[in-house]
Amino acid sequence: MDSNTVSSFQVDCFLWHVRKRFADQELGDAPFLDRLRRDQKSLRGRGSTLGLDIRTATREGKHIVERILEEESDEALKMTIASVPAPRYLTEMTLEEMSRDWLMLIPKQKVTGSLCIRMDQAIMDKDIILKANFSVIFNRLEALILLRAFTDEGAIVGEISPLPSLPGHTEEDVKNAIGVLIGGLEWNDNTVRVSETLQRFTWRSSDENGRSPLPPKQKRKMERTIEPEV
């Protein structure tokens, strides 16, 4: 096993532990707590894949971080922080909407890249909106935290989430996954639309008027343009 892979996992485990202690003191905001839960699932998946114990990895990660901090001057730390662009975290869903459990009468699931798509194909003739929490950097979608499909009544009927065991996905991965989800839901005559915020950062405007590059019908309600793959 590559030593960099192991040490990276160890450092991630320790940094998660520090963030958890911070959250235990009720100091974290909603995006912070959301990332904490997502990263916990990711670490469990990576630990299982690598065959490493998380507690042991956390202790080793602490030693690595302490060694780095001993060698790091305050001035070097300031320069490092200043040179790293900070992503923005955009929330279209409340904490309750993100953490709510939901059931599927006719469950369908598909994995595309490192994203898992789930939907209830028992849903028919509904108006559905896709909302997501995600991070943005340089005006581009950086990472999807969670996307869910809601009916007008507020019921959850589908979602796209990163697989904990396969970290990392691209903007194209997200667009492809959204296309699959829309195709599956529209197969049962549901009308699906994507939130304006998600459209703006996933399908960035490319014309001189700043309009979304989606065709008019697709922009309005993301008409059925993709055959269902789920």
Curated annotation (Swiss-Prot):
One of its GO terms (biological process) is symbiont-mediated suppression of host gene expression. Keywords: Eukaryotic host gene expression shutoff by virus, Host cytoplasm, Host gene expression shutoff by virus, Host mRNA suppression by virus, Host nucleus, Host-virus interaction, Inhibition of host innate immune response by virus, Inhibition of host interferon signaling pathway by virus, Inhibition of host PKR by virus, Inhibition of host pre-mRNA processing by virus, Inhibition of host RIG-I by virus, Inhibition of host RLR pathway by virus, Interferon antiviral system evasion, RNA-binding, Ubl conjugation, Viral immunoevasion. Residues 223-230 are annotated as: PABPN1-binding. This is Non-structural protein 1. Signal peptide: none annotated. It comes from Influenza A virus (strain A/Hong Kong/156/1997 H5N1 genotype Gs/Gd). A motif (Nuclear localization signal) lies at residues 34-38. Residues 1-73 are annotated as: RNA-binding and homodimerization. Inhibits post-transcriptional processing of cellular pre-mRNA, by binding and inhibiting two cellular proteins that are required for the 3'-end processing of cellular pre-mRNAs: the 30 kDa cleavage and polyadenylation specificity factor/CPSF4 and the poly(A)-binding protein 2/PABPN1. In turn, unprocessed 3' end pre-mRNAs accumulate in the host nucleus and are no longer exported to the cytoplasm. Cellular protein synthesis is thereby shut off very early after virus infection. The keyword Kinase does not apply. Pfam families: Flu_NS1 (PF00600). Residues 180-215 are annotated as: CPSF4-binding. Residues 204-230 are annotated as: Disordered. It comes from the Viruses. Homodimer. Interacts with host TRIM25 (via coiled coil); this interaction specifically inhibits TRIM25 multimerization and TRIM25-mediated RIGI CARD ubiquitination. Interacts with human EIF2AK2/PKR, CPSF4, IVNS1ABP and PABPN1. Upon interferon induction, ISGylated via host HERC5; this results in the impairment of NS1 interaction with RNA targets due to its inability to form homodimers and to interact with host EIF2AK2/PKR. GO terms for cellular component: host cell cytoplasm; host cell nucleus. One of its GO terms (molecular function) is RNA binding. It is found in: Host nucleus; Host cytoplasm. InterPro entries: NS1 (IPR004208), NS1A (IPR000256), NS1A_effect_dom-like_sf (IPR038064), uS15_NS1_RNA-bd_sf (IPR009068). The dsRNA-binding region is required for suppression of RNA silencing. Belongs to the influenza A viruses NS1 family. The gene is NS. A motif (Nuclear export signal) lies at residues 137-146.
